[in-house]
Amino acid sequence: MLERIGISLEDGLLEQFDKLIAEKGYVNRSEAIRDLIRDALVQRAFTESSGREERVAVVTLVYDHDSSSLAQKLAHIQHENHRAVVSALHVHMDPHNCLEVLVLRGRGKDVVAMGESLVATKGVKYGKLVPATAGHDLG
């Protein structure tokens, strides 16, 4: 069952939001707001868990493979945590830059620790840890 709610936004904020949802292909504001709420709930569940529950996350990394031993450092972290690495994708973006996408699974605190360790490795140009969920509690 859907329940109708009302919100108040400044004109400029609403204009920016409407542009954003149009660019992303949302049919209406409601679906975009539902996605924002779901994302916030997944983030909260991931960070507020006791750390013992099994969690799944995706880590995205961009780095220069010519950077001094960086690829080896990243591989070492993955090998140290090999049970948590479900899948890894490596893409050569250009002659120097690589994209790695890792799917991690394990105890929440272990997944977060590994993901943060990879993202914080010196030489990583861009890194992000994104929690995932099966959506059982999202309605």
Swiss-Prot record:
Protein name in UniProt: Putative nickel-responsive regulator
Keywords for the protein's UniProt record, in alphabetical order: DNA-binding, Metal-binding, Nickel, Transcription, Transcription regulation
List of residues binding Ni(2+): H79, H90, H92, C98
Cofactor remark from the record: Binds 1 nickel ion per subunit.
Record keyword Transit peptide present: no
Similarity comment text for this entry: Belongs to the transcriptional regulatory CopG/NikR family.
Signal sequence residues: none
GO biological process: response to nickel cation
Pfam families assigned: NikR_C (PF08753), RHH_1 (PF01402)
GO molecular function, one term: nickel cation binding
Task of the protein: Transcriptional regulator.
NCBIfam families tied to this protein: PRK00630.1 (NF001884), PRK01002.1 (NF002169), PRK02967.1 (NF002815), PRK04460.1 (NF003381)
